[in-house]
Every structure is written in structure tokens, then in C-alpha cells.
């Protein structure tokens, strides 16, 4: 059982890299939306802009769950990622913070453009320290070629990545998918990242 868990987390690490790399580097389309219906291998997803998209998965797909967490779960030494907006003082106001399991350390490490909102950024790195700030806790996150201070406000969504399973993805589930468009207009992906217990991928 322990070995199976380790293998699952290792696969999660490998397959989740697309979550945190620039789209141009992956030649992928990031789909954010809600599962409307499931017809055999076909997932019908309504994107945030109301567009209906059809998605299939590759063989042996990976299901990655997003579980609700809190700032209390973030400790120095953990590897985290955050989508947010840069502020005039050089800090990054976090829209969300996702906590990686140790097996995923290094995934998408760095600071780069993200497509959640205009001018949004993604920062993935190691938590050096957490201090109190005027607007909320401030995480010092160090990556291979720099460091950013992430301001975590009461509105910031904090979640953790955990191994998931197919049965949890049902109509109404909020999902994030990094997919490739197929010649027939459908999309295909090796994994689905989805919200568990009401959580939704905020990135």
C-alpha cells in the first residue's frame, strides 16, 4: 500500500507539471469550468465563459483532487505555488495558494506569466518564512533564480493537491484541465484536476 501511494504521488508530480508552466511551452489549452455531463469516456464541460467543451482523457489518466486547506497548514520548508497579481511595492497579492505534497517539490518552479487574469503571475517555490502584514500573512517564497513575497488576504483561496479518483468527478464538479485540441474540435488531456468537498481549482 505504501509503495502504491508513493507511485501515485510520483505520477501526480510528473503529470501536474502542465499546471504550472507557461501555455506556450506546453502547446496546451487551459480549461477551467464545471462538468455538465459524462457520456462514457466523454466529459462535457462548461467553461467559465459559458462555452461548452468536449473532453476525453488519454489511457491511464490521472485524477488530482484539490482539498481545502488553511494558512495554518503552510509551514516553512514546504513547496507551494500561487497565482496572483503584482503590487506596486513588488509583492504578489495571492488569489490562491496551493500546497504541493513533498513528492511534487520543484513542480513548475519559478515566477512567470499566468492566464487566470490579465497580468496575473504564477510563483512556485519554497516557503522560507511567514510574517504578519497589514493585509494578512506574507509568505517569503524562494525559487531557483529569485524570491517573491506573497500577501495572503482573507479572500485568498488555500488548497492542497492530493491523489484523486474517477468516481469523484461527477456533474457539477469544478475542474481544471490542461488539454490539447484535437482535429475534431474536442480536447484531450492526461489528467483532470478537480475540487473536492466543494473546493474549486482557483488557478
Give residue ranges: language-model regions:
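Bacterial N-terminal signal peptides that target proteins for export
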Residues: 1-10
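Short, flexible, surface-exposed loop segments at domain boundaries
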Residues: 2, 18-203
Amino acid at each position: 500500500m505504501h509503495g502504491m501511494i508513493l507511485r501515485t504521488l510520483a505520477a501526480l508530480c510528473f503529470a501536474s507539471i502542465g499546471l504550472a508552466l507557461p501555455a506556450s511551452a506546453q502547446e496546451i489549452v487551459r480549461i477551467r469550468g464545471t462538468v455538465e455531463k459524462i457520456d462514457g469516456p466523454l466529459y462535457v464541460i462548461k467553461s467559465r465563459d459559458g462555452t461548452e467543451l468536449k473532453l476525453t482523457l488519454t489511457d491511464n489518466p490521472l485524477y488530482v483532487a484539490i482539498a481545502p486547506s488553511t494558512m495554518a497548514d503552510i509551514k516553512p520548508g514546504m513547496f507551494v505555488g500561487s497565482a496572483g497579481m503584482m503590487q506596486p511595492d513588488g509583492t504578489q497579492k495571492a488569489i490562491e495558494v496551493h500546497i504541493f505534497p513533498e513528492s511534487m517539490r520543484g513542480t513548475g518552479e519559478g515566477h512567470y506569466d499566468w492566464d487566470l487574469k490579465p497580468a496575473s503571475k504564477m510563483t512556485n517555490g519554497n516557503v522560507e518564512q511567514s510574517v504578519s502584514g497589514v493585509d494578512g500573512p506574507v509568505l517569503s517564497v524562494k525559487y531557483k533564480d529569485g524570491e517573491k513575497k506573497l500577501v495572503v488576504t482573507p479572500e485568498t483561496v488555500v488548497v492542497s493537491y492530493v491523489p484523486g479518483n474517477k468516481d469523484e468527478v461527477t456533474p457539477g464538479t469544478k475542474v481544471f484541465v490542461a488539454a490539447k485540441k484535437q482535429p475534431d474540435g474536442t480536447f484531450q488531456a492526461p489528467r483532470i484536476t478537480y475540487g473536492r468537498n466543494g473546493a474549486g481549482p482557483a488557478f
